[in-house]
């Protein structure tokens, strides 16, 4: 199956919302990062949420069974760099792996950390 289940993390009913996790570069050069979270792809321009992140990881509670994208804006020394990533936040019914009714949430992890500085 390739999917490991921790039965202690089960939901007894299918959740309708959960957290997406966004990893950002936060340091002395980049103390605050404007982010835009989109439903679907960034190019679809379906804005879900706009904020400024001051720590990483950044969590946002959103509806499940949806693809989300994030665009982070890094500005320093008059230069701006954008980082983009996306992932689907899913629910999965895995009761056959546990002794109880079990729903888990998978995905929803985005990494918009700078690869270089």
Give a label for each model feature.
Residues 3-117:
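First exposed extracellular module after export/assembly in secreted or surface-exposed proteins
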């Amino acid at each position: 199956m390739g999917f490991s289940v921790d039965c202690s993390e089960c939901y007894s009913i299918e959740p309708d919302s959960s957290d997406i996790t966004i990893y950002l570069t936060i340091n002395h050069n980049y103390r605050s990062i404007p982010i835009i979270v989109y439903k679907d792809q960034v190019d679809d321009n379906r804005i879900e949420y706009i904020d400024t992140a001051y720590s990483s990881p950044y969590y946002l509670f959103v509806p499940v069974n949806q693809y989300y994208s994030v665009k982070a804006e890094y500005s320093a020394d008059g230069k701006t760099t954008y980082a983009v990533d996306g992932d689907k936040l899913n629910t999965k019914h895995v009761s056959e792996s546990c002794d109880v009714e079990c729903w888990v949430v998978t995905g929803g992890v985005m990494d918009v950390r700078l690869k270089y500085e």
